[in-house]
Swiss-Prot record:
Function: DNA-dependent RNA polymerase catalyzes the transcription of DNA into RNA using the four ribonucleoside triphosphates as substrates.
Biological processes annotated in GO: DNA-templated transcription
Gene for this chain: rpoB
CDD domains per UniProt: RNA_pol_B_RPB2
Species in which this protein is naturally found: Azorhizobium caulinodans (strain ATCC 43989 / DSM 5975 / JCM 20966 / LMG 6465 / NBRC 14845 / NCIMB 13405 / ORS 571)
Iron is among the record's keywords: no
Enzyme Commission number(s): 2.7.7.6
Cellular component terms per the entry's GO annotation: DNA-directed RNA polymerase complex
Family recorded in the similarity comment: Belongs to the RNA polymerase beta chain family.
Gene3D superfamilies: 2.40.50.100, 2.40.50.150, 3.90.1100.10, 6.10.140.1670, DNA-directed RNA polymerase, beta subunit, external 1 domain (2.30.150.10), DNA-directed RNA polymerase, subunit 2, domain 6 (2.40.270.10), RNA polymerase alpha subunit dimerisation domain (3.90.1800.10), RNA polymerase Rpb2, domain 2 (3.90.1110.10)
Subunit structure of this chain's protein: The RNAP catalytic core consists of 2 alpha, 1 beta, 1 beta' and 1 omega subunit. When a sigma factor is associated with the core the holoenzyme is formed, which can initiate transcription.
Composition bias type Polar residues, residue spans: 1357-1368
UniProt name for this protein: DNA-directed RNA polymerase subunit beta
GO MF annotations in UniProt: DNA binding; DNA-directed RNA polymerase activity; ribonucleoside binding
């Protein structure tokens, strides 16, 4: 593999044997591609494609007014640059969005009142602002009101036609009732269904059903056409004693003769009664010369007439089409002299009489009646007229504005019904409806299969772009109504397009979608993996999708078509299981929204490297082999039979029948599951937990990439955007903790800058309060290629995902401290900050303008000691770096108090002695209970026009200095590049002119140039015209770049100095960020990658932990009983391989030390070649070899890809290479006694994660606090500073125990006895220990409720006999 900048610093030994031909697509492609297609920001030469935003505008415009005198047309749209960049939006709480400018054309017509002819009177074109459209950041997220959000893709039922049956559940007989449903992208649903009597009905939009023939009448067919469409006809002719029926062998399939079949010509019996006739036998009869059968009059009875039989002369109808033949009808026809009767070909075996029966049951017989009937169903209570009924029926399915099948729907419909309509025909056609009814009737006759709605060919993905498109269309349609009304109410000749447009409804629709749609979610930003998974999530919930309650087992289950498209492992546990899925690693979404998986094409039994993406529908036609089928060097299958998948089944076929082969074994799992080594040895349930828990791993202070990985770590780190990759190749010019400056070395476009400045995020807060901190990996002078990782982010190390730490584990019980999955840790882990993480909490204080005057942020707070103000600066805001504890003031703030009415004396004194300070109360922002930490950042926002305080000005100065430094650095590199080129071009040339004091016609030398300031070098002129024009070009470009740099700087400074847009009524806002360091402690949840989770039960002193023969203490002790029943053996194999990694690391470390001693590098090279083989090592130089060796001291990292990883033999081989026992077990000694344990113990390195369920966030205590308003009981929950609920079962426990006083206390003074709790407080203050409890407030609430029902309840005092009135809070003190 070609080594990257970070890749050669630490090479992973790779166990995979299958070569991967397909490149893994970018992991957040789903989001980016979809939204780019929606926006189409750059307008190409020939105009934009009819997609996304363009399609929405095209579908809504042109808009005409009601009279047709004016028309508003859409010309094009363009985006202006966004007002704030991503970082500014994050800090100021803004939405990262670009203003959308639409060019509209208003055409006014002159309408001739007599002829109605139109002529153009006036055309006006104008750019109109139509709101902001949120833009996607580089990482596939949106910033809405300062928070990062993700729009999750939705899985929904694809538009098209579906055939299904009720599985016999509707009718008691268990008969299968078939139904078809045409689902459009938008518009009315059409259902066509059978009932138990085999009559076919249609429903529109799930309303009352009507016979399907009424629908056909409304489409313009008459009874005869309907019958001709669905049935063949047979012509019976009169013979001398009966009728003659043409013999057709095709109709005889499965026919059983009831009576003898007699040849009409010869009179012979060809088939005896009771015999079955096969198609083959029937063919033989034809070959023997059988042309027609003889049918008696009795057999004619019960057949159906095929067309109206009419007297040609009088027009009298003897029999109608579809009428049943009776003896009476036969006699009438015979008397009238008809000797030929067309009969419908209905044999009740291959063809049923369903449509004919429906026709005879239908009370409507003409188009008008049918239309009226449909109108009554759709709009009950309105009297129908023919015009309104016709218009309504047309608008249901045949009006492109109301009904849209979408391209997908049309394609699916064509495929299912074998039609060939263009995919631009987005409305229903008559032939579509007829084809659906035909297919449904054939299903009832036993031909064909019903559809599987969980097949991924029938479910499609709606990504961001499409969801946004639908939402925007809703907004535009709202706007369209307003425009139409406004066009008719204004003087159309004088208005401009801008006067007609009100962008509010569109902006509101967009804001509503991003702010409150079920699919717009707060991004899970715990670590880079959780971000990527969130962006690749597929949800079946949301608007237009399923609901949890209605979703059955089938929808949630794994389907064969999920293979390579949706991960069968990663899904949440709980009520959403199976409804929320993850995209598989190699999957992508095609233009129709179906998920495609990649396959290698197989030609004549030889596997080629051509990669083809197939959707689930296409894949069903082919035979697909697995990725791990053994191949020879030529790419042919080694075995005679190959296991394949075909149409959802697994078969064994010969190699020449194979069409495709999987590209990679990991293509069937998602990103999170592909990060689990030895996934193939884990039970699926535990793998599910493992992939879900990796997403909850907290970024640690010192991340460490896993020793045993899968090779996916680098991919995730790169694609998630956590680690920074170089945008262009170049040389590192400057680097410090906050930024990296790279001088681009490739050919740069003159209009672009030759300098890349990367700002690193330092201690920023993520959505989940974890810490985002980036660290540079490069030094000045390093050469990087495009795409190389130059800085690590949270949970990444050397460009690889690092969610946890490698720790030395022993699998053994230890004094019961690892009972029930508990975890025992060594004190060493705490001491060395192995599992320490930093969490950043954000607090904000706002100074508002109140009715009584403005609030003020100040250090001058009444009744607060100087001690409490020690961390505040003169503006009343806490210093950066201050250590704060619960209850400390972060921002001092005072609020004016309402004046109490003054007595005359007070007024007099006030008048004599002047104003005393108005009353204010302390409303400072204090640190809530349970947090301690360090202030890492403070941001001050001022409203426009409010004077900035010292602190705000200081922050602003700092920011401007930073911007100026960026500008100066970029300028310096630009100068260096330009003047370097200038000097190269001028030196050695003869100057014909130059700066002052330069002699003409002398050669320019380096020294000569050095005598003049660089700005004067431009004054040199030489005789070579070509050179001079090149110099001019360079100068123009240089000046342009310089101007652009300065302008960018000034823009940013202007933005900084401008006031901030704050919520209404807020004058000033201060945000304070507190970093909290959380060491691991008992109660924290930890987990491995195999679903092996547990809670830390105890942290044991190092000297008591078990130790190895060389004295090394183990870090963590896990219970071996957690493995067998859970069947996640992967963790044991990982432990063994990790042990081998560490052993090899020790050997490399010894070789590095030997090299330092002897300076002979061959020792080190040999040690590395022993581990990796020669290919990777030969290309490295001495410095790189040493760096690699140093990085491998702790262990040689390995990659064991999913389903293609290390086997037991490989692990044993590596254990032996490392000089360790191949069993992977070691003798352990008890740290407390120093004696060896009886048996050898499995010891090795396992990768453990600390999860985001920290005991510090859960532990909580309250003495007094807020109470609920009505019941006066304490609130619940940590967030409300609530109490613990003493519930029904707890009451039973105290009752059973007989603890009467405790129980009374629980139900009164500790809960809602308002007077009682005050008395208790007073008693405690006085030091007494007697108190009485009174009436609980909830009892008063009960009494009040009974009174509201008209039942008066009074309490009588037993001593005095007078009533004590419940339900009033007399002379009670105010609640706390």
């Amino acid at each position: 593999m070609a080594q990257t900048f970070t890749g050669r610093k630490r090479i992973r030994k790779f166990f995979g044997k299958i070569k991967e031909v397909a490149e893994m697509p970018n992991l957040i492609e789903v989001q980016k591609a979809s939204y780019d297609q929606f926006l189409q920001i750059e307008e190409p030469k020939g105009g934009r494609a009819d997609d996304g935003l363009q399609a929405v505008f095209k579908s809504v415009f042109p808009i005409s007014d009601f009279s047709g005198a004016a028309m508003l047309e859409f010309v094009r749209y363009e985006f202006e640059p966004p007002k704030y960049d991503v970082d500014e939006c994050r800090q100021r709480g803004m939405t990262f969005a670009a203003p959308l400018k639409v060019t509209l054309r208003l055409i006014v017509f002159d309408v001739d009142p007599d002829t109605g002819a139109k002529s153009v009177k006036d055309i006006k074109e104008q750019d109109v602002y139509t709101g902001d459209i949120p833009l996607m950041t580089m990482n596939g997220t949106f910033i809405v009101n300062g928070t990062e959000r993700v729009i999750v893709s939705q899985m929904h039922r694809s538009p098209g036609v579906f055939f299904d049956h009720d599985k016999g559940k509707t009718h008691s007989s268990g008969k299968l009732l078939f139904a078809a449903r045409i689902i459009p992208y938008r518009g009315s649903w059409l259902d066509i269904e059978f009932d138990a009597k085999d009559i076919v009905y249609a429903r529109i939009d799930r309303r009352r059903k009507i016979p399907v023939t009424s629908l056909l009448f409304a489409l313009g067919l008459d009874s005869e056409e309907i019958l001709n469409t669905f049935y063949e006809k047979i012509l019976y002719t009169r013979a001398k004693d009966g009728w003659r029926m043409p013999f057709d062998p095709k109709r005889m399939k499965g026919y059983k003769a009831v009576a003898d079949l007699i040849d009409a010509d010869t009179g012979e019996v060809v088939v005896e009664a009771g015999k079955k006739l096969t198609v083959r036998a029937a063919r033989q009869l034809v070959e023997k010369g059988l042309k027609a059968l003889k049918i008696s009059d009795d057999e004619m009875v019960g057949q159906y007439i095929g067309e109206d039989i009419v007297n040609v002369h009088t027009g009298e109808i003897y029999a109608e089409a579809g009428e049943e033949i009776t003896e009476k009808v036969l006699k009438t026809l015979g008397d009238a002299g008809f000797d030929e009767i067309p009969v419908l070909d209905i044999d009740h075996i291959n063809t049923g009489a369903y449509i004919r029966n429906t026709l005879s049951a239908d009370k409507n017989s003409s188009r008008e009646e049918a239309l009226f009937d449909i109108y009554r169903v759709m709009r009950p209570g309105e009297p129908p007229t023919l015009d309104s009924a016709q218009a309504m029926f047309h608008s249901l399915f045949f009006d492109a504005e109301r009904y849209d099948l979408s391209a997908v729907g049309r394609v699916k419909m064509n495929m299912r019904l074998d039609l060939d309509a263009e995919d631009t025909v987005r409305i229903l056609r008559r032939e579509d409806i007829l084809a659906v009814i035909k297919t449904l009737v054939e299903l009832r006759d036993g031909k064909g299969e019903i559809d599987d709605i969980d097949h991924l060919g029938n479910r499609r993905v709606r990504s961001v772009g499409e969801l946004m498109e639908n939402q925007y269309r809703v907004g535009l349609l709202r706007m369209e109504r307003a425009i139409k009304e406004r066009m008719s109410s204004v003087d159309i000749d004088t208005v401009m397009p801008q006067d007609l447009i009100n962008a509010k409804p569109v902006a509101a629709a967009v804001r509503e979608f991003f702010g409150s749609s079920q699919l717009s979610q707060f991004m899970d930003q715990t670590n880079p993996l959780s971000e990527i998974t969130h962006k690749r999530r597929l949800s079946a919930l949301g608007p237009g999708g399923l609901t949890r309650e209605r979703a059955g087992f089938e929808v949630r289950d794994v389907h064969p078509t999920h293979y390579g498209r949706i991960c069968p492992i990663e899904t949440p546990e709980g009520p959403n299981i199976g409804l929320i899925n993850s995209l598989a690693t190699f999957a992508r979404v095609n233009k129709y929204g179906f998920i495609e998986a990649p396959y290698r094409r197989v030609v004549d039994g030889r596997v080629t490297d051509e990669v083809v993406y197939l959707s689930a529908m296409e894949e069903g036609k082919y035979y697909v082999a697995q990725a791990n089928v053994p191949l020879d060097t030529d790419g042919r299958f080694q075995e005679d039979l190959v296991i394949c998948r075909h149409a959802g089944d697994v078969l064994v076929v010969s190699p020449d029948r194979v069409d495709f082969m999987d590209v990679s074994p990991k293509q069937l799992v998602s990103v999170a599951a592909a990060l689990i080594p030895f996934l193939e040895n884990d039970d699926a349930n535990r793998a599910l937990m493992g992939s879900n828990m990796q997403r909850q791993a907290v970024p640690l202070v010192r991340s460490q990439a896993p020793l045993v990985g899968t090779g996916m770590e680098a991919v995730v780190a790169r694609d998630s955007g956590a680690a920074i990759a170089a945008r262009r190749a170049g040389v590192i010019d400057q680097v410090d903790a906050t930024r990296i400056v790279i001088r681009a070395t490739g050919e740069t476009d003159p209009s672009k800058s030759g300098v890349d400045i990367y700002r690193l995020m330092k201690f920023q807060r993520s959505n989940q309060s974890t810490c985002i901190n980036q660290r540079p990996l490069v030094r000045v002078g390093d050469v990087v290629k495009k795409g190389d990782i130059i800085a690590d982010g949270p949970s990444t190390e050397l460009g690889e995902l690092a969610l946890g730490r490698n720790v030395l584990v022993a699998f053994m019980p230890w004094n019961g401290y690892n009972y029930e999955d508990s975890i025992l840790l060594s004190e060493n882990i705490v001491k060395e900050d192995v599992f320490t993480s930093i969490h950043i909490e954000e607090f904000e204080a706002m100074a508002r303008d109140t009715k009584l005057g403005p609030e003020e942020i100040t250090r001058d707070i009444p009744n607060v000691s100087e001690e409490a103000l020690k961390n505040l600066d003169e503006a009343g805001i806490v210093y950066i770096g201050a250590e704060v504890r619960a209850g400390d003031i972060l921002v001092g703030k005072i609020t004016p108090k309402g004046e109490s009415p003054m007595t005359p004396e007070e007024k007099l004194l006030r008048a004599i002695f002047g104003e005393k300070a108005a009353d204010v109360r302390d409303t400072s922002l204090r640190l809530p209970p349970g947090t301690t930490g360090t202030i890492v950042e403070v941001r001050v926002f001022n409203r426009h026009g409010v004077d900035k305080d010292e602190r705000a000005l200081a922050i602003e100065r700092e920011e401007i200095e930073r911007l100026a430094k960026d500008r100066d650095d970029e300028q310096a590199i630009l100068d260096r590049n330009v003047y370097g080129r200038l000097s190269e071009m001028l030196v050695g040339k003869v100057a014909i002119a130059g700066p002052k004091a330069f002699k003409k016609d002398t050669e320019i030398t380096k020294d000569a140039l050095g005598e003049y300031p660089r700005s004067q070098w431009w004054l040199f002129a030489v005789a070579d015209d070509a050179l001079m024009s090149e110099l001019e070009a360079i100068r123009a470009q240089y000046d342009e770049s310089k101007k652009r740099l300065e302008q960018r700087f000034l823009d940013k400074v202007e933005k900084l100095q401008r006031g901030d847009e704050l919520p209404p009524g807020v004058m000033k806002m201060v945000k304070v960020f507190v970093a909290v360091k959380r060491k691991i402690q008992p109660g924290d949840k930890m987990a491995g990658r195999h679903g092996n989770k547990g809670v830390v039960s105890r942290i044991v002193p190092v000297e008591d932990m078990p130790f190895l023969e060389d004295g090394t203490n183990v870090d963590i002790v896990l219970n071996p009983l957690g493995v067998p029943s859970r069947m996640n053996v992967g963790q044991i194999l990982e432990t063994h391989l990790g042990w081998a990694c560490a052993g090899l690391g020790r050997q490399v470390a010894a070789a590095v030390d030997a090299y330092y001693g002897s300076k002979d590098q061959q020792v080190l090279r040999n040690a590395l070649v022993k581990v990796y083989g020669p290919d990777d090592i030969e290309v490295l130089d001495e410095k790189q070899i040493t760096e690699l060796g140093e990085n491998l001291r702790k262990g040689v990292p390995m990659a064991t890809p999913v389903f293609d990883g290390a086997h037991e033999a490989d692990i044993e081989e590596h254990l032996e290479k490392a000089g360790l026992n191949p069993s992977g077990q070691s003798t352990l000694f008890d740290g407390r006694t120093g004696e060896p344990f009886d048996r050898k113990v499995t010891v090795g390195y396992i990768y453990m994660l600390k999860l985001h369920h920290l005991v510090d966030d859960k532990i909580h205590a309250r003495s007094i606090g807020p109470y609920s308003l009505v019941t006066q009981q304490p609130l619940g929950g940590k967030a409300q500073f609530g109490g613990q609920r003493f519930g029904e079962m707890e009451v039973w426990a105290l009752e059973a125990y007989g603890a009467a006083y405790t129980l009374q206390e629980m139900l009164t003074v500790k809960s809602d006895d308002v007077a009682g709790r005050t008395k208790v407080y007073e008693a405690i203050v006085r030091g007494e220990d007697t108190f009485e409890s009174g009436i609980p407030e909830s009892f008063n609430v009960l009494v009040k409720e009974m009174r509201s029902l008209g039942l008066n309840v009074e309490l009588l005092n037993s001593k005095t006999g007078r009533q004590t009135n419940p339900g009033t809070r007399e002379n009670l003190p105010a609640a706390e």
